[in-house]
Amino acid sequence: MAKASSRGGGKKKVKRTVSDGVAHINATFNNTLITITDRQGNALSWASAGGSGFKGSRKSTPFAAQVASETAARAAQDYGLKNVEVRVKGPGPGRESAVRALNAVGYRITNISDVSPIPHNGCRPPKKRRV
């Protein structure tokens, strides 16, 4: 009879501790994505409004961005993160509420910068939205 192979005889993966990180907030018109990385850009945690349980037009609300930001922030707390630099990209409605949620979770925000790509008269933008 074949012997059952035992799995996992290797080393246990140790979670590293990171004191300073960067929170990348990508706020589009349809969704908000938050990725928390270390200074080198290695992802520690991420969350989106769609992945947090919001579907359809509810993804593009400030409350959905707040919930997604709290989810990503709590997942990154396992790494011992204390200070966060925030980089916001995009024109979406969840920009400000995502930053406020990071502050409410308990991170010390050291810097907030807008890294939205600005065209030097490049592609024609989509038609004006009709509500």
Swiss-Prot record:
Q: What is this protein called?
A: Small ribosomal subunit protein uS11
Kindly list the organism's lineage: Bacteria, Pseudomonadati, Pseudomonadota, Gammaproteobacteria, Chromatiales
The UniProt gene name for this protein comes to: rpsK
One GO location term (cellular component)? ribonucleoprotein complex
Keyword Chaperone: yes or no?
no
Intrachain disulfide bonds: none
Checking NCBIfam families in the record gives: PRK05309.1, uS11_bact
Quaternary organization: Part of the 30S ribosomal subunit. Interacts with proteins S7 and S18. Binds to IF-3.
Q: Provide the alphabetized UniProt keywords.
A: Ribonucleoprotein, Ribosomal protein, RNA-binding, rRNA-binding
A Gene Ontology BP annotation from the UniProt entry: translation
HAMAP family xrefs = Ribosomal_uS11 (MF_01310)
